[in-house]
Amino acid sequence: LGAIGAGDIGDHFPDTDPKNKNLDSSAIVMHAIRLAIEKKLILNNLDITLLLESPKISDQEYKITMKRNILEMFFEVFHICCPDIISKTNPRNIFTDDMINIKASTSESLGFIGKGQGVTCYCIVSLKNLNNEH
């Protein structure tokens, strides 16, 4: 949302709205993807850093699964929002797993994260103009 100047999660999914209680986070991600596409912007690069004690994210299979799930959200929204482009280009040629980097670190047992009481995620999103892709 920040990469497209669309405020924050609370602007779109207020915690005062009961329907947002226990909302699947993929709904938030897909909403942000749709808003970006409406502004003619698509993913250039996504860099994710997870800060947690467990589970250990160093396992490549876990990272591959996370990337696959993220890419599937892009494909699903792109199919809905861009049928004209889909007719010309396979979105799997537009969104590839090398556009997403996932890494993890611990807080070396410090603070609430180090005690296993929470997780932090930092993301940097780079977008590009959709019109340059097809």
Task: State where each predicted segment sits.
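Functionally constrained cores in energy, signaling, and assembly domains
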Residues: 32, 36-39, 93-97, 126
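Glycine- and Gly-Pro-enriched alpha-helical subdomains that act as flexible
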Residues: 1-41
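Short, conserved loop-to-beta-strand elements that form functional interface hotspots
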Residues: 43-113
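Short glycine/serine/threonine-biased micro-segments
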Residues: 3-5, 109-116
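Divalent-metal-activated hydrolytic enzyme cores
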Residues: 46, 132-133
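Hydrophobic residues within well-ordered alpha-helices
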Residues: 29-32, 70, 123
